């Protein structure tokens, strides 16, 4: 069942059927109800979630304990995974991911991924490469957005760091 669901996910199209089966063995189907937190900002590095249905919201805490919505992700969209950093990194989650509707997902635990890496499984290394490319693309986009935010603030004659920070958090998209 998990392997069949992975087969239809664009993010995993580079895997062979056998490699998808390897991931499916250590994965599980999970469901989150609307409002339920899937990943909590600052939380321990955790699992990769492959969204198969539903919609999630990605938000970040900003000044004064406020939360800023960064993105909404539909399971049917091009980006159908959340939690990529949790597989590769050691730092806490950079944002909160919350179910905006009922969400069904495939959970690939960090433990499963790390075991596959330690066993030298090519599928895990291929997934690492795919995640690295995705993160590099996002970093490039973020750099462009930061430069644009600075230019806009300079055009308006603003030099206040707080104004820049708020502008960055408002316009930053995951």
Question: Which ranges hold each PLM region?
Answer:
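A small-molecule sensor/coupling module
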Residues: 20, 93-94, 111-153
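Cyclic nucleotide-binding regulatory module and flanking cytosolic helices
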Residues: 1-29, 33-34, 172-173
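Cyclic nucleotide-binding regulatory domains
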Residues: 37-101
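A short hydrophobic beta-strand segment most commonly corresponding to one strand
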Residues: 103-108
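Alpha-helix boundary recognition
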Residues: 7, 24-25, 74, 98, ...
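Short, intrinsically disordered, mixed-charge
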Residues: 25, 29, 87-90, 118
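Phosphate-/nucleic-acid-contacting segments
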Residues: 145-174
